[in-house]
Amino acid sequence: MITHASFGQDVKGYIKDAESKEALAGVNVFYKDKGGTRGTVSDINGYYELKVTDGDAVLTFSYLGYETLSVPVKVDPGEFLTHDVSLRTNSNMMDEVVVSVGRYEQKLSDITVSMELLKAKDITRQSPKDLTDVLKNISGVDVTDRQPSVRGGTGWTYGVGSRCLILVDGMSVLTPGSGEINWNMIPMENVDQVEVLKGASSVLYGSSALNGLIHVKTKRPGLDPVTQVNVQGGLYGKPRQDGTPLYGGLDLSHSRRIKNFDLTVGANTFLDDGYRQDNYNRRVRVGGNLTYHDPRVQGLNYGVNVNYLYNDYTGFFIWRSPEEPYIQSPLANMGRRENTFYIDPFLNYTNSEKGTTHRFKGRFFHRGSRIITHTTDKSLFDITNNMGFDISSVPEIINMAQNWQTELLPTFLPYLPEVMNGKVSGLMAELGKLGNHFFPTATSADYMDLISWVMGRTPLPDKNNVGAWLVDAMKPMEKKAPEATDHTYSYNLDYQFSKKFEHSQLTVGGTYERIHADSKVTGQHSSDNVATFLQYDHKFIDRLNVSVGVRLEYYRVDDFYREAETKIFGAKVPVKPVFRGGLNYELGEYSFIRASFGQGYRYPSVTEKFILKDIGGVGAFPNAELKAEQGYNAELGFKQGYKFGNLKGFIDVAGFYTRYKDMIEFRFGLFNNKTFDYIDGLSKLFNAFSSGDGLGIGAQFTNVGRAEIYGVDLSTSGVYEFNRDTRLAYTLGYVYTNPIDMDVDSRNAEEEANDDLMAMRSKSNDSKYLKYRQKHSVKGVFDLEWKQFNIGTNMSWKSKTLAVDYFMVDERTKAEPNLMDYMRSMLFGNLHDYWAENNKGYFVMDMRVGMKVTKNVHVQGLVNNLLNKRYSARPMDVGAPRTFILQVGANF
């Protein structure tokens, strides 16, 4: 739209979005004359003013994500023109604007790596409880136990330490110290778009971006105030349990401009009973942004982001038994009550004439956390009664204990030669008879209750307190919270400078982060992280984009560890250099080929290195020798836009290769409670008991050696316009990954040579594959809109899990069970047969139907896991059953 006031030498006006009528700040307005190109940019209110030489000129209005508009004008001396311009968003998906790749705005078609993009409308339709509900529908992205993995880069780490960095407006939401992702901190009520970058991103963003990057961009206020309210309620179906667990949430957000201020505030409350017993999540979060655009200096703004979260939740580690998969094992029940707060001051200055931008960011972070654990709620009487124990058997037990040489030794001694030869079936059969004699109805879950009860009642009684101990033993166990609160503090500074040239962009910057953790989980530890980075992007012949970058990083934990270390001319330097490079070439109209190479690394978090805690009976054990993992990612990709009548979209195919050194993985098994040694032999087992150190069940982070992951990522997105009122949007993706343990042959040979009765293996089979990965994944999202109605579906199929921990499952064929088989049966029930029957791949489908009741109010009903499939990506963790959701939202 153009309006003419009169003619003259000055041209001015306002620039708005053609649909929303919101002012567009930062629009490039320019024209060419004999002296070159002259131009300006619009301010926060969309206002521009430009001096134009006499005569004819063509004004060009250019803004990323919008169609470029050219307007011819005729200028007479001594007069002026007013041009109010409305720009339309670019309907081409490949012209979408992203910022994650180069820390500045680029077209999706110009970037040199693979990226997926989700807009706010796509996210709201999913009615997510948090961002994980959205990410699981993206091709190449998996979420296991709330831990994201891009193209098989991560297995199962129980949420601690992440190879995928999560950002909100450029700042990390990984919890300092532990490296876990706090999904509850992400303001879902105010998300504008989510960018998922596939591949190493350590050059610009540092550690934890080894496998990829997920960047959440929040909305900014327009000219008119906007208030959004969203209410949702969910009802879990009944898989095989009593009761009907519920969840519900409320989102509120408000944004507006007040003179030179931008104000955004948001709040969320969420209560989830969980579909598994004692697996709940309760949160309250409030936050906001205040930005001041200084009228005295064009391009200068500064302000602050604030966020506070109260969270009370429990995790789910392992089940009670295959018959009770939605009930936690009494040995694995842990929760947290947390108060998390951060404040992020910032300052941005852009000089449009010089093409330079300065960005300063800071953060103060604090988390107070209390771990809540309990073993079993049952009393000793309850447990033994369930096991069929007869109180009249007590004298018999006492007699056996006092006269074990005559009562027990003759029964078990004959099996000693078999045991020495590695056969334990006869001995275990006799022990089974003895157990069945006293506990005729006992199950594996009952034995776990008994073990859990004993762990919760230690120390055992002596002759002076037997009576009091027995009275207390008849009482059920209760949840206990530690007296002390764990505290984690973080201080962060980030500076970025960018210079835009005619055909290139230079970005340089530096970061500093200080973390201090005072915790019962890890003890007291501090870390320092200092880095500087540089990236240069250049466009050649209007078709070729080339990008190169480097990062230097220093990291230290306490005073004794330098995780980032490099040899230069034989000398060790406490700095880790990381390089990346990429190119994108436009073959033809909407046809692009790209190639990229990026190094990455990730130093272990304080928690991974020093963790020592009980997960309600199951422990987590430290590994002070844990080293930083490093690797690189290479990719060759092709993107092609297409248009056939009313159908338009693009197809993207990429081949990728990732290699790791000193890869950090989660090892589950038995450990010495004091030395933290991994128990992989009878001698270590006996030493743990004879020394009084004790034995623990749990996990430890360890470096597993070399690994490589390669495959193909194929996806397509598009829209078919049936008519003015009807359209179908779709996204389809297939990913093939081949996750290889490069040291598998030597490791298998070493493990095969160990004939100890307690010999442990690294994983559940002798295959070449890494643990907790799948080879094939197919995902699809479809949404049909007709007038004010919409109907949509998500579909996902994944092939079987290739390998898991040996301590959980042994898939090898044996002539007879070994000692570990009997131990697994007692701990986890008949998990072997359950896993063999159910680990065959799975298909999950969600459905949704919605309607716009009025212009500002919409209602939507959803059914997740429509077919009520029971599925698992890892043993003893069953996915949610069929879930019914109602969502009501309003904008005004």
Regions found by a protein language model. Give the residues of each.
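Short, acidic, small-residue-rich periplasmic hinge/interaction motif at the N-terminus
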Residues: K16-S20, N28-K34, S62-E67, D76, ...
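Short acidic/polar hinge/loop motifs at secondary-structure boundaries
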Residues: E49-K51, M171-K198
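Extracytoplasmic beta-strand/coil segments of soluble accessory domains associated
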Residues: M115, T132-M171, T175
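A beta-strand signature from Gram-negative outer-membrane beta-barrel systems
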Residues: M185-N230
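Gram-negative outer-membrane beta-barrel transporters
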Residues: N230, I541-D542, F656-R659, Y678-F807
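Flexible loop and strand-edge segments within Gram-negative outer membrane beta-barrel domains
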Residues: D272-R283, T291-H293, V297-K354, H358, ...
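Membrane-embedded beta-barrel scaffold of Gram-negative outer-membrane proteins
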Residues: R359-R363, R367-T373, E586, F592-S596, ...
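Structural signature of Gram-negative outer-membrane beta-barrels, strongest in the C-terminal barrel
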Residues: H503-I515, S519, G523-R659
